[in-house]
């Protein structure tokens, strides 16, 4: 028999076998007219919080107890559980950061996560660290839209399949394409972050042909934006659901925007959600969208019923993990649990404690003190000039002997409370390990730069904090610029500092690290801040309070 006949015969046999299989195999493994219970538990934006905070809130030991109890309860009632994470395990507290989030990924494995989305902060470290973290995790880290620029192939597993009582569930992973500007440019030069909406549509079509799932979920790190109003951010979960065919995704388990996704009505988010409140998830184009705030503060619980191929949500809840509220008792403020205290799992505590002790041994030494709060809260520092933003910029300016300083608010990760300041406080505020850099430019170049950087919108990490400069921003244009109390001269020469991350184009800033006047000092931002605090202690926070140096005017309304 010649080769062509062998191939033809083999193909004919394969086609007949395939047709016979289609005729004899059931289309599904579940039983008709039977109601199945399925619960999806989820967290997101963990950011290194493996240990409880100083008030005894959240932490992975309490989370494990809660999830173990929920699993036992659900399985006792005949249901099944899927545990998912919306990503950003990395970057947040020094005890985790100094150990490459080893306690966090290994802790997630012990809790029993089924899958997670890769978040943008997974790319704050070199790729070899991320690959090491994959080895620590006994669950898949998913992203369908991240490719190797050289090979054109996906860098990570795009989806995972799960079988729950005969129900075939495909879980696809998607990562914000903003990672290209939010990730450290030094580590992602060969990584291509493609449009997750397009990748999702193509992958869903492929899965329907190859895997024939009963349900398709997406675990994403793209952000939830009310009614899809995303500003300068890349498209998020709402845009994803609307882009796909209706009902292509049964559920999106999200992250990135770090909020409880609880709706008051269609396309209207509940603005003042408090722990213990009822939570109604978003629903767009036949897709449920959920997100559980941040740091393991909550475990989201979505209870479904599956019957004859149809999925319906029975209930949804955000369960607080030992969150507390302040009350007044006999004229004094006390913190009490919002709900019953969740006992910390002893085995998990024993596992995590050595990591916590190792980290703390390096961090809890006092380096300075202050007479008030240095403001770095996300919902403040991304909207207005603050004393902490100005202090950090001043520290950079002093180290580089610069005329003024630019500091992206996304690099200010927390506040520093009044009183003693430790190295841990510094690393919590600046965990990324960016270098302080500076550039010498002409006045015209400076003005061109400011017209891009100083006009970045609020509510984004690109919003800039400044020191050593005053200006007015109106209609996306910078005017009345003074540097060192002298008006900007277009033919003058000026030096300013900027984090190396932004100098490389991060946050959409102009890429200036190839400018002939650019210098990377080699000093990490946290080290510079630590040295500045030590040498200027005690810190008078009032000296750094903004007093109208940077004025924004929009629709005749002036903001600082």
Swiss-Prot record:
Subcellular location: Cell outer membrane
Residues with lipidation of kind S-diacylglycerol cysteine: 22
Positions that bind a divalent metal cation 2: 88, 120, 221, 256
Cross-referenced PROSITE patterns: 5_NUCLEOTIDASE_1 (PS00785), 5_NUCLEOTIDASE_2 (PS00786), PROKAR_LIPOPROTEIN (PS51257)
InterPro entries for the chain: 5'-Nucleotdase_C, 5'-Nucleotdase_C_sf, 5'-Nucleotdase_CS, 5_nucleotidase/apyrase, Calcineurin-like_PHP_ApaH, Metallo-depent_PP-like
Positions annotated to bind a divalent metal cation 1: 45, 47, 88, 258
Annotated site (Transition state stabilizer): 121, 124
Family statement drawn from the similarity comment of this UniProt entry: Belongs to the 5'-nucleotidase family.
Function statement: Degradation of extracellular 5'-nucleotides for nutritional needs.
Designated name of the protein: 5'-nucleotidase
């Amino acid at each position: 028999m010649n080769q062509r006949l062998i191939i033809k015969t083999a193909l004919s046999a394969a086609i007949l076998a395939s047709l016979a299989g289609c005729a004899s195999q059931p289309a599904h493994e579940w039983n008709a007219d039977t109601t199945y219970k399925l619960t999806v538990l989820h967290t997101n934006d963990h950011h290194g919080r493996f240990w409880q905070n100083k008030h005894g809130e959240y932490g992975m030991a309490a989370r494990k107890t809660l999830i173990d109890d929920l699993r036992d309860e659900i399985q006792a009632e005949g249901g099944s559980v899927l545990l998912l994470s919306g990503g950003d395990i990395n970057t947040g507290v020094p005890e985790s950061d100094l150990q490459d989030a080893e306690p966090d990924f290994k802790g997630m494995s012990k809790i029993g996560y089924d899958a997670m989305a890769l978040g943008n902060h997974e790319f704050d470290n070199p790729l070899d660290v991320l690959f090491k973290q994959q080895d620590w995790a006994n669950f898949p880290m998913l992203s369908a839209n991240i490719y190797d620029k050289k090979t054109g192939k996906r860098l990570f597993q795009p989806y995972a399949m799960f079988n729950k009582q005969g129900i075939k569930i495909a879980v696809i992973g998607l990562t914000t394409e903003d990672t290209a500007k939010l990730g450290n440019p030094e580590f992602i030069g060969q990584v291509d972050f493609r449009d997750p909406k397009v990748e999702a549509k193509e992958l869903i079509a492929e899965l329907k042909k190859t895997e024939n799932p009963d349900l398709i979920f997406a675990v994403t790190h793209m952000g939830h934006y009310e009614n899809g109003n995303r500003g300068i951010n890349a498209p998020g979960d709402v845009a994803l659901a609307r882009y796909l065919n209706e009902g292509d995704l049964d559920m999106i388990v999200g992250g990135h925007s770090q909020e409880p996704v609880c709706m008051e009505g269609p396309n209207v988010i509940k603005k003042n959600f408090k722990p213990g409140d009822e939570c109604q998830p978003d629903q767009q184009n036949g897709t449920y969208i959920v997100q559980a705030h941040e740091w393991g503060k909550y475990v989201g619980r979505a209870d479904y019923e599956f019957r004859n191929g149809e999925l319906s949500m029975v209930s949804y809840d955000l369960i607080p993990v030992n969150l507390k509220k302040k009350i007044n008792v006999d004229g004094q403020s006390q913190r009490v649990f919002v709900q019953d205290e969740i006992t910390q799992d002893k085995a998990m505590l024993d596992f995590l404690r050595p990591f916590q002790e190792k980290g703390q041994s390096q961090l809890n030494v006092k380096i300075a003190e202050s007479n008030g709060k240095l403001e770095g809260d996300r919902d403040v520092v991304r909207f207005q000039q603050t004393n902490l933003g100005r202090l950090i910029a001043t520290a950079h300016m002093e180290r580089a002997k610069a005329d003024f300083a630019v500091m992206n608010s996304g690099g200010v990760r927390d506040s520093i409370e009044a009183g003693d300041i430790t190295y841990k406080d510094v690393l919590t505020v600046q965990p990324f390990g960016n270098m302080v850099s500076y550039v010498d430019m002409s006045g015209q170049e400076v003005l061109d730069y400011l017209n891009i950087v100083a006009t970045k919108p609020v509510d984004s990490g690109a919003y800039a904090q400044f020191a050593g400069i005053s200006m007015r921003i109106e209609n996306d244009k910078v005017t009345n610029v003074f540097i060192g109390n002298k008006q900007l001269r277009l033919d003058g020469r000026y030096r300013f500092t900027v984090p190396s991350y932004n100098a490389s184009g991060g946050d959409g800033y102009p890429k200036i690290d190839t400018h002939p006047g650019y210098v990377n000092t080699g000093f990490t931002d946290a080290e510079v801040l630590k040295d500045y605090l030590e040498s200027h202690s005690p810190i008078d926070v009032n000296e750094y309070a903004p007093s109208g140096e940077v004025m924004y005017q929009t629709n005749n309304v002036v903001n600082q």
